[in-house]
Amino acid sequence: MLTLKKSMLLLFFLGMVSFSLADDKREDEAEEGEDKRADEGEEKRAAEKKRFLEGLLNTVTGLLG
C-alpha cells in the first residue's frame, strides 16, 4: 500500500511539473509574435537534435570504448 501511495504521489508531482512547464511555455508564446515564434521553434528543434545526437554519440562511444 505504501509503495502504491509513493508511486501515485510521484506521478502527481511529475504531472504537475509538466503542466506548470507547459503553462509557462504557453504564456511565453502568447507574448511573442507569430513570426518570431516560428524562427525560435526551428532553432530550438535544431539545438535539441544536436544535443540528442551528441548524447547518443557519447553513449555509443562510451559503450564501445
Swiss-Prot record:
One of the GO BP terms on file: defense response
Keyword field: Amidation, Amphibian defense peptide, Cleavage on pair of basic residues, Secreted, Signal
Any GO CC annotation of this UniProt entry: extracellular region
Signal peptide per UniProt: 1-22
Principal subcellular localization: secreted
Location(s), subcellular: Secreted
Name of one Pfam family that matches: FSAP_sig_propep
Modification type Leucine amide: residues: L64
Tissue-specificity statement: Expressed by the skin glands.
Pro-peptide positions on chain: 23-51
Region (Disordered): 24-45
Recorded family membership: Belongs to the frog skin active peptide (FSAP) family. Brevinin subfamily.
Function: Induces contraction of smooth muscle in isolated guinea pig urinary bladder (EC50=4.66 nM). Has no antimicrobial activity against the Gram-positive bacterium S.aureus, the Gram-negative bacterium E.coli and the yeast C.albicans. Elicits histamine release from rat peritoneal mast cells.
Protein name: Kassorin-M
The organism of origin for this protein: Phlyctimantis maculatus
